Amino acid sequence: MVLQPTYNWVCFTMLPENMEIVRKYPNLNYDGRMSIKLGANYMYLKNTREHTPENAVILWPSSEAFTKGKSPFTAEISNKIYALRFLYPRKLVIPFDFGKSHYVDEITHVAIVNGEGFEYVPYEVEKFENGILPIKKPENK
């Protein structure tokens, strides 16, 4: 049977790998399986999803920020479409969008990756490696 390359990948690579994880860890929930399969990428996306509202517009870091030094991330996470699969209905703005997207003026959160991104946060905050910050400074309670 002759299939298009994408179908070959789905049928003979992706599905068998996914089924191997399901067989090896039958009691894991979705988050557990995705953590095993995608590692730090999934954990970062999950954390971002859990700490932003659905209507958030997130300034997403460049591929250089995600892959610098001994980063735990792979290059895929810097791809806007890849990240949106996990973060939808949130919107992402990447540095390439500056001057091209009307969402640039609506950014509500800044993704911090490998210690980069603090320059977009308009208030002082203690530095950390990976996380998400709102553009508006949270009120002290």
Residue map of PLM features:
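Aromatic/acidic, Gly/Pro-rich catalytic loop(s) in extracytoplasmic/lumenal soluble domains
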Residues: 6-8, 98-141
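Extracytoplasmic
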Residues: 38-39, 48-50, 54-106, 124-125
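Membrane-proximal, lumen/periplasm-facing interface regions of secretory-pathway glyco-
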Residues: 3-44
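Generic hydrophobic, helix-prone segments enriched in Leu/Val/Ile
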Residues: 6-18, 77, 81-89, 93, ...
